[in-house]
């Protein structure tokens, strides 16, 4: 303390009244550390008063920062006396009582921080404000410099771009959109002769939808004559009408009167009674809503009833007999619309059909549209009572988004659309895109609830709402900065909807970082009890900063690996998510430690003080206090169970059963690889993303597409209407996609081939040969009418010889029989043929003319005999066969036609081809980038390989489980699989870095060290993310559900592989010391501390005196008394710390001078570090008081004058300092052994045979020579325990001191400046001397636990 005359001065956290009875002025302070003072010094206890320190400082719960305006300092005596000096005397003397002299000095209000830790500790508010200002500026620039978010088309971007097939499809779509009268390309050479059409004014996307509508209409059966009885309906049902599928509630047949009446009743109550139905329905000539095409209405028409409800059972029986009779002709293919009616120009085969089957359209439409394909099929026609499983109802409403109100008010409720007989199980209302947008906004609550669960679990673990809130703010800030970089720095124009998933995924990364940092922060309090806030920040960030950099870089690299995909949405997500992880890593380095320092300094003490200060008051207050006490009791129980699980059971279980864990997880990974890649493997999609699955499988919209659509015969494609794959050959336009591959909203334009020349004689001959060669191929099929023929040259020859050649007047082309023709004549004749056969510019002859009337391109088509399929295999065979044939032909083409290419209906195949090849490549690249990042960060090959093996096992098992869950490899699944590496890599890196930074050289101790240090935070992270995934399962949107499943599965499996598989691999093959390490010059590893060369140690400080005492090697046989002696030693009055973290010490046994730190601060750092890492050997049986245990030492100053014997400071077993402000988590004690949990097991506590027992350093006080120097002597062990390692982490033990006093003062005596006194190892035999070991003053940069 300072002299009494010093005025009272205030620190930032404490008020320190200082008094000086002598009135002497305060000498200027030199350092800011606590140091023991020699009693003969002028600054001894007699000169100072020791007032009561504040409560929080006494308990060791808070650390003063070096940046306080009034710092707590200590004076350093200039005397040369020390403990080292006293050891030169011939007699051992009791050391003096350690007394701390504290003074207060005034410092400058503002000063520049000396280092990163000083900046965080001294200016936490400034750091946080600076980060907030940076986030605000980036957010403002990102919002102002980018277009507003548009999620109107959430599935946009899931079609492959920038692939060979994709480029050709984009160019072909652009050519179709730009072809027409008054357009860039035309079918006629003279645009003035063509009238404008609707298609020329449509955009490419709108034109495609219009063409699709035309194609769908053409596939419908053509109109036929309507009979008088059919005037009940408004025409015939079309595919464009809204459809409902009815099933039986009881599982029986729908062909009964009760079920038919039930369907009519549900339609009337839930659809026709809706207020919007009248405005949407199709109306008859009488301006009334047309009746529905339903089972009951067709039955009423055949039975001459006025409505569905008037039908009887006899009507159903009579109609069933008629349908049974006519079904035979329908399935034979002779009952077709052409045979229906009374017209005379029927096909000849219609004579086979009886008149009662063709007298009306009702019978045909009954069988073709309303009944499922199995009802009255040839296989079930002989059944006495056929079963109708599904019945279709066509509403007189065109499929449109206007049906949303009807769906939400009635059809969307399963209870309203079902009764005791029937229920609506499937729907096709054309509402999937519109309903997707609705549910995307409606189900957003599930991801938000998942976020609440994540941060609520974090707050329970941290016990701080402030840190939790700041962590959430850091996540949001990181996303906003990433959004700024995404748009402004990377120039990305498209922001897909899937990028919003980054909020949930980045929150999981934040939880992992925050929990680990807080564990290390609490741990550093016990390791650095008096080092100040800057040293505590530096101590924590020494380990956490390394872990954060490695984890952040590896995770972002894994996400960036997905950029290799050709799906624009996946590439945009990879870029945004990888950038967000990097930004969050950078902000965490500043934001998180500053937040914790701010909480530690201003919030933690105040909150606890208020809680302890309110002891009385009203009944509600007492009730709250009672509840608080119960919660604390429950929390203590959870803490005890957590300590038992993560500090004892988990390390023991991993190390003891490591053989089982390796085999089990390797088998799981191999099984996942086989299931996902061989059989049954992930199935490719059979629908395009716009027609794919949006909602969960039980949704009626999805059930109609997946189950019911193929149950009705009208959905089948007729064999002569687009059933086969066409081939489109293009010359004159290069297959170059000019659109932005990362923006699916952009459309490509056409790029002309400058070398295109189809008029040369060689080109004419080659085109004719190409026609004949294609006709001889096995894939060439029958050509439909009106198609542009592949044989353009033959068509021109036929036209020249036909009478129609001269229809436009005399021309040079007519009658030309010489071949090949002159180039100018050839081009002129092609133009004349186009004008004659397509005067309005609507017939496609395969010619494309530009605006000047010149031939710009050739587009020739032919039909193959290969049927279109949604399966990948047949279409892949078609594509490879056509590509091989065309490549061969193009190799023979003349220079003007050698740039030709082909395309077809390959949209689905393009997606399937990308999904069949890219996920494996993307996952492999992500794993390779993760390995490279780990290797560059740790420079350790085995650890990098083991980490990547654990991540790969997680991904393989995830894929296998997804196959068992019947997932298809669709676009969403490809996105989540590409992100699985980034989601699972951080948990493994936690253990990898903790293992790498462990100061212990042997692999078992390092495995236990990493498990005890990281496992609880890893388990908590996995738990909260698993819970968040469960929360998202009830969502209607399939994207949310699958995101929840992926998060659950990847995090759970990743935790298992990291905790058991990776650690078990390290138990077997983990690197020891420098094994597998890529060494660089001047490299210093954590476990190299204490093994420096004596000469190097001599240069570290002034010379001193040091003795080395060598113990006898331990036996390799384990004693039966292992467990008994361990248990009794814990119950004895002397400290015993079980450990297997033996530090290898290669020092020699000769006399050499010990090194003292050059400054008290260095002394403090060295002393604390060594005490937590330098082990020794100790006997373990119950201690005997009869042994010769010295109680006092006699100290001697430099002049040889003896001082009074002083009692040594006692110190009990090492433990965590218990604080009234905040309890440390169990298992985070700095002095606890890394394998303390293994001491209870007789099987797992044995050391490896490969680990040698090191030499220890010691000096015996009983054996001294005449000059006061110790005599080296072998120590004795009683042999009761073999290969047991004990860590020296205590000061001198005093048996007269109570155990409670030992516990309360153990942390205070540890690490004090100048405390390098020897430590006694009591022998269990009363007739043998104890062993005394000298504490070396060696500083190591390792991080101890």
UniProtKB/Swiss-Prot annotation:
Recorded name of the encoding gene: Disp2
Cellular component per GO, a single term: plasma membrane
Residue ranges, annotated region (Disordered): 1-28, 1251-1271, 1295-1345
Name the UniProt record assigns to this protein: Protein dispatched homolog 2
Glycan-carrying positions: 304, 420, 776
Places the protein is found: Membrane
Domain SSD: start-end pairs: 429-598
UniProt keyword annotations, A-Z: Glycoprotein, Membrane, Methylation, Transmembrane, Transmembrane helix
């Amino acid at each position: 303390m300072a002299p009494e005359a010093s005025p009272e001065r205030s620190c930032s956290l404490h008020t320190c009244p200082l008094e000086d009875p002598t009135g002497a002025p305060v000498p200027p302070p030199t350092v800011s550390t606590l140091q023991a003072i020699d009693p003969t010094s002028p600054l001894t206890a007699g000169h100072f008063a020791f007032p009561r320190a504040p409560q929080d400082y006494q308990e060791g719960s808070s650390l003063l920062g070096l940046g306080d305006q009034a710092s707590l300092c200590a004076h350093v005596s200039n005397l040369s006396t020390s403990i080292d000096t006293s050891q030169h005397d011939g007699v051992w003397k009791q050391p003096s009582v350690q007394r701390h002299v504290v003074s207060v000095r005034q410092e400058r209000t503002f000063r520049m921080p000396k280092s990163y830790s000083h900046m965080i500790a001294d200016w936490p508010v400034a750091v946080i404000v600076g980060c907030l200002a940076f986030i605000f500026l980036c957010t403002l620039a990102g919002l102002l410099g980018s277009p507003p978010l548009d999620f109107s088309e959430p599935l946009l971007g899931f079609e492959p771009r920038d692939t060979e097939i994709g480029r050709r499809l984009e160019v072909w779509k652009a050519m179709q959109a730009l072809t027409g009268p008054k357009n860039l390309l035309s079918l006629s050479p003279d645009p003035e002769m063509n009238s404008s059409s609707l298609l020329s004014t449509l955009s490419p996307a709108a034109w495609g939808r219009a063409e699709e509508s035309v194609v769908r209409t053409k596939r419908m059966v053509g109109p036929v004559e309507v009979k008088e009885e059919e005037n009940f309906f408004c025409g015939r049902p079309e595919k464009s009408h809204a459809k409902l599928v009815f099933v039986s509630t009881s599982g029986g047949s729908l062909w009964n009167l009760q079920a038919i009446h039930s369907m009519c009743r549900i339609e009337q109550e839930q659809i026709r009674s809706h207020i919007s139905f009248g405005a949407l329905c199709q109306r008859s000539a009488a301006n009334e809503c047309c009746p529905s095409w339903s089972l009951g209405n067709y039955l009423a028409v055949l039975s001459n009833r006025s409505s569905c409800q008037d039908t009887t059972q006899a009507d159903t029986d009579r109609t069933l007999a008629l349908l049974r009779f006519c079904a035979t002709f329908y399935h034979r293919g002779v009952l077709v619309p052409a045979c229906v009616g009374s017209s005379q120009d029927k096909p000849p085969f219609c004579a086979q059909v009886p008149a009662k089957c063709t007298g009306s359209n009702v019978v045909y439409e009954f069988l073709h549209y309303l009944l499922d394909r199995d009802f009255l099929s040839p296989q079930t026609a002989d059944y006495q009572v056929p079963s109708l499983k599904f019945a279709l109802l066509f509403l007189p409403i065109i499929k449109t988004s206007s049906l949303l109100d009807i769906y939400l008010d009635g059809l969307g409720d399963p209870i309203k659309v079902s009764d005791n007989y029937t229920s609506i199980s499937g729907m096709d209302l054309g509402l999937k895109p519109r309903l997707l947008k609705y549910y995307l906004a409606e189900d957003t609550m599930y991801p938000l609830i998942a976020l609440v669960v994540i941060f609520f679990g974090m707050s329970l673990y941290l016990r701080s709402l402030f840190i939790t809130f700041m962590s959430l703010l850091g996540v949001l800030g990181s996303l906003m900065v990433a959004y700024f970089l995404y748009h402004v720095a990377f120039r990305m124009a498209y922001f897909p909807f899937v990028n919003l998933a980054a909020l949930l995924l980045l929150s999981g990364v934040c939880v992992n970082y925050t929990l680990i940092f807080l564990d290390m922060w609490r741990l550093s309090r016990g390791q650095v009890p008096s080092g100040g806030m800057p040293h505590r920040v530096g101590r924590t960030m020494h380990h956490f900063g390394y872990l954060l950099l490695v984890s952040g870089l590896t995770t972002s690299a894994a996400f960036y690996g997905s950029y290799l995909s050709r799906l624009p949405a996946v590439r945009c997500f990879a870029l945004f998510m990888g950038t967000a992880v990097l930004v969050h890593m950078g902000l965490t380095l500043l934001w998180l430690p500053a937040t914790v320092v701010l909480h530690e300094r201003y919030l933690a003490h105040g909150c606890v003080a208020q809680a302890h200060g309110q002891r009385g008051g009203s009944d509600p207050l007492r009730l709250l206090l009672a509840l608080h006490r119960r919660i604390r009791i429950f929390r203590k129980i959870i803490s005890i169970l957590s300590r038992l699980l993560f500090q004892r059971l988990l390390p023991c279980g991993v190390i003891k059963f490591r053989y089982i864990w390796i085999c089990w997880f390797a088998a799981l990974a191999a099984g996942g690889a086989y299931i996902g890649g061989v059989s049954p493997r992930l199935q490719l999609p059979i629908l395009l993303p716009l027609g794919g699955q949006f909602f969960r499988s039980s949704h009626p919209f999805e059930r109609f597409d997946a189950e019911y659509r193929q149950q009705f015969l009208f959905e089948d494609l007729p064999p002569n209407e687009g059933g086969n794959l066409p081939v489109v050959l293009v010359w004159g336009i290069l297959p170059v996609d000019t659109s932005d591959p990362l923006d699916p909203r952009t459309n490509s334009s056409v790029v002309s081939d400058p070398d295109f020349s189809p008029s040369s004689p060689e080109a004419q001959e080659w085109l004719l040969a190409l026609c004949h060669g294609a006709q001889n191929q096995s894939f060439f099929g029958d050509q439909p009418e009106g198609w542009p023929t592949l044989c353009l040259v033959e068509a021109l020859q036929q036209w020249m010889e036909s009478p129609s050649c001269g229809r436009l007047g005399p021309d040079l082309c007519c009658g030309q029989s010489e071949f090949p023709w002159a180039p100018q004549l050839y081009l002129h004749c092609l133009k004349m043929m186009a004008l004659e056969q397509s005067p309005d510019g609507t017939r496609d002859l395969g010619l494309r003319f530009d605006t000047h009337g010149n031939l710009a391109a050739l587009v020739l088509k032919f039909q193959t005999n290969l049927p279109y399929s949604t399966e990948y295999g047949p279409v892949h065979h078609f594509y490879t066969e056509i590509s091989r044939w065309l490549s061969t032909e193009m190799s023979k083409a003349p220079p003007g036609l050698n740039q030709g290419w082909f395309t077809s209906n390959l949209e689905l195949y393009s997606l399937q081809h990308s999904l069949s090849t890219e996920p494996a490549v993307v996952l492999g690249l992500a794993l390779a980038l993760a390995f490279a990042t780990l290797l560059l960060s740790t420079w350790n090959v085995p650890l990098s390989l083991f980490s990547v093996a654990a991540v790969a096992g997680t991904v393989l098992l995830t894929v296998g489980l997804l196959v068992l869950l019947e997932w298809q490899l669709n676009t969403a699944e490809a996105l989540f699989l590409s992100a699985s590496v980034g989601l699972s890599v951080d948990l493994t890196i936690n253990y990898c870095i903790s293992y790498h930074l462990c100061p212990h050289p042997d692999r078992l101790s390092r495995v236990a060290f990493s498990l005890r240090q990281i496992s609880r935070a890893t388990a908590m992270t996995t738990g909260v993310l698993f819970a968040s995934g469960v929360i998202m399962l009830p969502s209607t949107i399939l994207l949310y559900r699958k995101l929840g499943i992926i998060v659950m599965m990847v995090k759970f499996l990743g935790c298992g592989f990291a905790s058991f598989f990776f650690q078990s691999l390290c138990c077997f093959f983990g690197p020891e010391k420098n094994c597998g390490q890529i060494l660089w010059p001047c490299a210093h590893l954590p476990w190299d501390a204490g093994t420096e060369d004596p000469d190097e140690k001599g240069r570290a400080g002034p010379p001193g005196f040091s003795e080395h005492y060598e113990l006898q090697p331990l036996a390799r046989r384990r004693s039966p008394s292992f467990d008994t002696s361990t248990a009794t030693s814990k119950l004895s009055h002397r400290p015993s710390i079980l450990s297997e973290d033996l530090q290898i010490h290669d020092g020699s046994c000769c006399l050499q001078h010990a090194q003292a730190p050059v400054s008290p601060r260095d002394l403090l750092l060295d002393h604390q570090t060594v005490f937590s890492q330098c082990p020794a050997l100790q006997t373990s049986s119950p201690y005997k008081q009869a042994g010769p245990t010295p109680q006092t030492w006699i100290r001697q100053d430099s002049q040889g004058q003896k001082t009074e014997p002083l009692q040594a400071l006692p110190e009990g077993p090492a433990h965590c300092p218990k604080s009234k402000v905040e309890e440390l988590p169990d298992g985070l004690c700095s002095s606890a052994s890394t394998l303390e949990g293994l001491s209870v097991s007789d099987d797992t506590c044995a050391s490896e045979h490969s680990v040698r027992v090191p030499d220890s350093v010691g000096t015996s006080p009983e054996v001294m020579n005449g000059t006061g120097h110790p005599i080296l002597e072998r120590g004795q062990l009683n042999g009761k325990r073999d290969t047991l390692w004990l860590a020296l982490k205590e000061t001198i033990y005093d048996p007269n001191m109570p155990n409670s006093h030992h516990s309360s003062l153990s942390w205070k005596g540890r690490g004090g400046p100048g405390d390098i006194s020897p430590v006694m190892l009591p022998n269990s035999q009363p007739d043998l001397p104890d062993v005394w070991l000298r504490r070396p003053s060696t500083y190591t940069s390792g991080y101890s636990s």
